[in-house]
């Protein structure tokens, strides 16, 4: 499972070499959309899955299966500022226009995620792993619509990335929280080694 930012190419034709590299990796490859994946928008998921059938699976508005778990996911969205800080780096306030824009994007991503959960449940699955590119909460939040839907569907784990650099690794939930395991899998956080979500 790769949680986003697969290529810097803006068009599919510019990404083929990167996707071919991913194809050559061992095992089954399921891709989630990241904020840098400009070649892939929601309307293209179905056509990408048709073109790469049997080689790569693009996870958005659908679900994949591993053992007895349905794998659901979406890019997500997290408000990342700008924040206004005091001299000690404490947050005094933030840009409310940017926050409002982020809330609209969260609503859109939640619609996609709920559709994926619904499809998986209709297919008979009752165990879920939820994947996001962005972290499930911002540094201002303890909970969010993403943590709420994870609890609603009693997911086994929430797996996310996007947070890079030691100063950002603590931006969201890690470890056990309200009965759900939250895993940060950014490449630099893991030392560029795969993480085991399920045995």
Stretch-by-stretch model annotation:
Residues 16-17, 46, 85, 173, ...:
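Generic secondary-structure boundary signal with a strong preference for alpha-helix termini
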Residues 1-3, 30, 71, 129-131, ...:
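Structural motif
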Residues 11-13, 41-43, 81-83, 140-142, ...:
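Short glycine-/acidic-enriched loop or helix-start segments at secondary-structure transitions
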Residues 9-11, 37, 49-51, 109, ...:
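A short linear-motif detector with a strong N-terminal bias
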Residues 1-67, 142-155, 180, 185-186:
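Core catalytic region of metal-dependent phosphoesterases/phosphodiesterases
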Residues 43-141:
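Conserved catalytic scaffold of divalent metal-dependent phosphoesterases
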Residues 6-7, 35-37, 76-77, 135-137, ...:
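Catalytic metal-binding/acid-base residues of hydrolase active sites
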Residues 65-67, 148-158, 164-199:
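Binuclear metal-dependent phosphoesterase catalytic core
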């Amino acid at each position: 499972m790769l949680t986003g930012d697969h290529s810097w190419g803006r068009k599919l034709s510019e990404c083929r070499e990167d996707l071919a590299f991913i194809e050559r990796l061992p095992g089954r490859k399921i891709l989630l959309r990241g904020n840098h994946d400009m070649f892939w928008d929601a309307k293209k998921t179905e056509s990408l899955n048709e073109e790469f059938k049997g080689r790569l699976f693009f996870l958005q508005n659908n679900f994949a299966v591993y053992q007895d778990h349905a794998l659901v996911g979406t890019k997500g969205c997290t408000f990342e500022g700008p924040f206004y800080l005091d001299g000690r780096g404490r947050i005094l306030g933030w840009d409310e226009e940017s926050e409002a824009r982020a809330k609209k994007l969260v609503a859109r991503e939640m619609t996609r995620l709920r559709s994926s959960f619904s499809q998986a449940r209709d297919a008979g699955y009752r165990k879920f792993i939820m994947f996001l590119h962005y972290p499930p909460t911002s540094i201002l939040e303890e909970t969010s619509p993403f943590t709420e839907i994870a609890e609603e569907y009693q997911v086994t784990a929430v797996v996310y990335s996007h947070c890079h650099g030691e100063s950002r690794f603590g931006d969201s939930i890690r470890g056990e929280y309200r009965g759900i395991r939250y895993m940060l899998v950014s490449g630099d956080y893991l030392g560029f080694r795969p993480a085991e979500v399920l045995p």
